Curated annotation (Swiss-Prot):
SUPFAM superfamilies: N-terminal nucleophile aminohydrolases (Ntn hydrolases). This is Proteasome subunit alpha type-6. Keywords: Cytoplasm, Nucleus, Proteasome. Belongs to the peptidase T1A family. The 26S proteasome consists of a 20S proteasome core and two 19S regulatory subunits. The 20S proteasome core is composed of 28 subunits that are arranged in four stacked rings, resulting in a barrel-shaped structure. The two end rings are each formed by seven alpha subunits, and the two central rings are each formed by seven beta subunits. The catalytic chamber with the active sites is on the inside of the barrel. InterPro entries: Ntn_hydrolases_N, Proteasome_alpha, Proteasome_alpha-type, Proteasome_asu_N, Proteasome_sua/b, Proteasome_subunit_alpha6.
Length: 246
C-alpha cells in the first residue's frame, strides 16, 4: 500500500498522516453521524433552545429512560449527539468539574468556561494514546448575567465556538443551510419563536412531522435561568403552533 493512503496512520491517535490528518479524530466525527440522530440549537433574544430526535431502538424499552439532554448544573444544560455511553462519561466529568468550581469560587460556573473545559478535555484526548477521542458533539447552553443567552458547540477535535444557531449529527450541513437563511438578518427571537424555529428546522431537514414523543427539547430562559426539558404537552403545543402557522 502506498505511503499516502493512510495505512498504519489510522491505528494511532497521536500520529499525523503525510497529508496532515488525524484519522482517529476523523473517525470520531463519523461516529457522531453514525448514531443517525440530528440535533439543532438556536439562541434567541432572551432564551436558548436545543432540540434533537428521540429514537427508541427497542419496543420493550421504557422511552422515558432514553435521553440526550443532561443538566450539568441547575442553570447549564448539555445536549449530546453521538455515542450515548461516551456522552454519559463526559456529563459525569462535567458535573464534577462544575461542582468543584462552585465549591472553590462560590458562584456558578459560567457557560463559556464549562464549554472551554469540555473542549480542552477533548483536545487532550487527541494527543495521548491511552485515551481515544469521545464520539460526541456537545451543545452547551445557559443564560449568563453578563453575556445573556449562550450556546456553544464542542466537538471531538477540541474546537468550541459560540453560536447564534448550530446543528450536529447526520443532517448537520442541511440544517445549517436552513438556519443560515433564518438567521440572516440577525433576528431577535422571542422564547416561543426560538423553540419553534429549532423544531421546524429539524422537521424541515428530515422532512418529517414529528409527534411530541419523537423529539426532545431543552430550554433556558432569562426569567429564571434554569435549564429544563419541555414536557410532552409543551412540545405538542409548539408543534400545533408550527402546523397552524405553516
Amino acid at each position: 500500500m502506498s505511503r499516502g493512503t493512510g495505512a498504519g496512520y489510522d491505528r494511532h491517535i497521536t500520529i499525523f498522516s503525510p497529508e496532515g490528518r488525524l484519522y482517529q479524530v476523523e473517525y470520531a466525527f463519523k461516529a457522531v453521524k453514525s448514531a443517525g440522530v440530528t440535533s439543532i440549537g438556536v439562541r434567541g433574544k432572551d432564551s436558548v433552545c436545543v432540540v434533537t430526535q428521540k429514537k427508541v431502538p427497542d419496543k420493550l424499552l421504557d422511552h422515558t429512560s432514553v435521553t440526550h439532554l443532561f443538566p450539568i448544573t441547575k442553570y447549564i444544560g448539555l445536549l449530546a449527539t453521538g455515542l450515548t455511553a461516551d456522552a454519559r462519561s463526559l456529563v459525569y466529568q462535567a458535573r464534577n468539574e462544575a461542582a468543584e468550581f462552585r465549591f472553590k469560587w462560590g458562584y456558578e460556573m459560567p457557560v463559556d468556561v464549562l464549554a472551554k473545559w469540555i473542549a480542552d478535555k477533548a483536545q487532550v484526548y487527541t494527543q495521548h494514546a491511552y485515551m481515544r477521542p469521545l464520539g460526541v458533539v456537545a451543545m452547551v447552553l445557559g443564560y449568563d448575567e453578563e453575556k445573556n443567552a449562550q450556546l456553544f458547540k464542542c466537538d471531538p477535535a477540541g474546537h468550541f465556538f459560540g453560536h447564534k444557531a448550530t446543528s450536529a449529527g447526520l443532517k448537520e450541513q442541511e440544517a445549517i443551510n436552513f438556519l443560515e437563511k433564518k438567521m440572516k438578518d440577525d433576528p431577535q427571537f422571542s422564547y416561543e419563536e426560538t423553540v419553534q424555529i429549532a423544531i421546524s428546522a429539524l422537521q424541515s431537514v428530515l422532512q418529517e412531522d414529528f409527534k411530541a414523543t419523537e423529539i426532545e427539547v431543552g430550554v433556558v430562559r432569562k426569567d429564571d435561568r434554569v435549564f429544563r426539558a419541555l414536557t410532552t404537552e409543551e412540545i405538542d403545543q409548539h408543534l400545533t403552533a408550527i402546523s397552524e402557522r405553516d
